[in-house]
Amino acid sequence: MSVKNGLVQLENLTSMEKLSVDEVMGLIKRASAFKAGTAEFDLEKQTFASNLFFENSTRTHHSFHIAERKLGLDVLEFDAQASSISKGETLYDTVLTLDALGVDICVIRSGVEHYYEELVNSDNIHCAIVNGGDGSGQHPSQCLLDLMTIYEEFGKFEGLKIAISGDLTHSRVAKSNMMMLQKLGARLYFTGPAAWYSEEFDDYGHYANLDRILPELDVHMLLRVQHERHDSGESFSKEGYHNHFGLTEERAKMLKPTAIIMHPAPVNRGVEIADSLVESPQSRIVQQMSNGVYTRMAILEAILAGKKAK
């Protein structure tokens, strides 16, 4: 990984831990250039990408597809049910096969944490691996689009007060964001049910009472309650969660006029956030979705630059 002539070069993108501040800022600025229509990109040869999603996805899956098409890549959509995965083939052997067929980039989402380690450490797999989310582990492309959205608003990260609220333990978005936001100089707070907070977060910020810190925040980043990752009986009722931990209309009145509301989506309206606030003037949720395309264009460009530099 490196930055040369203003362009980031990546071999793979699996975790935010692997990225430097310079690389992150380079990707944000490149994504902004794609958004503004000022970025020049020339695909020098036919390039194939395949999107392997073993968990349901709307935003990540389709924004990667659109990003790939905007850059001129040939996209091989992958249906696990129609593939040899349904016959018992492993993810490793599936990627080994796609690599042998000539696929250059595999974007993968899996419920298995760290699935990518076996792939990137293989001597026989040469395609680039982009992690589209691994269980409760990491979600680097979501983190980067979140950072782009924050940077568009404030032009900095240093000194910003940011709360990440909700289902912390089960959230790969929280883990990716806390790592990089701390590195970029933001001051982090965590709020939500104490049962969904763990000691690993102590290295990055402070567990706080939401009502006490709301007036100080620059960014309130909400997280979806991930019922599919919970043990039975672990979840709250929708109304109970919203009243105790969600961004209600009354709580939103406590925010500074300059503060912004974020959510990686899908949004459970009336649970993490009041329905009326999802598209409110302070919300940047739709902007996050839009920025996902440009951020993923920047990621793919960096991967292609890394492959060319080898």
Curated annotation (Swiss-Prot):
Keyword NADP appears in the UniProt entry: no
GO biological process terms on file: 'de novo' pyrimidine nucleobase biosynthetic process; 'de novo' UMP biosynthetic process; amino acid metabolic process
Pathway named in the protein's UniProt entry: Pyrimidine metabolism; UMP biosynthesis via de novo pathway; (S)-dihydroorotate from bicarbonate: step 2/3
Protein name: Aspartate carbamoyltransferase catalytic subunit
Keyword Transferase set for record: yes
Top enzyme class: transferase
Binding residues annotated for L-aspartate, in chain numbering: 87, 172, 224
Cellular compartments per GO CC: cytosol
Recorded catalytic activity of this chain's protein: carbamoyl phosphate + L-aspartate = N-carbamoyl-L-aspartate + phosphate + H(+)
Assembly and oligomerization: Heterododecamer (2C3:3R2) of six catalytic PyrB chains organized as two trimers (C3), and six regulatory PyrI chains organized as three dimers (R2).
GO molecular function (one): aspartate carbamoyltransferase activity
Family affiliation: Belongs to the aspartate/ornithine carbamoyltransferase superfamily. ATCase family.
Purpose: Catalyzes the condensation of carbamoyl phosphate and aspartate to form carbamoyl aspartate and inorganic phosphate, the committed step in the de novo pyrimidine nucleotide biosynthesis pathway.
EC number(s) reported in the record: 2.1.3.2
Binding site for carbamoyl phosphate: 59-60, 109, 139, 142, 265-266
Gene from which the chain derives: pyrB
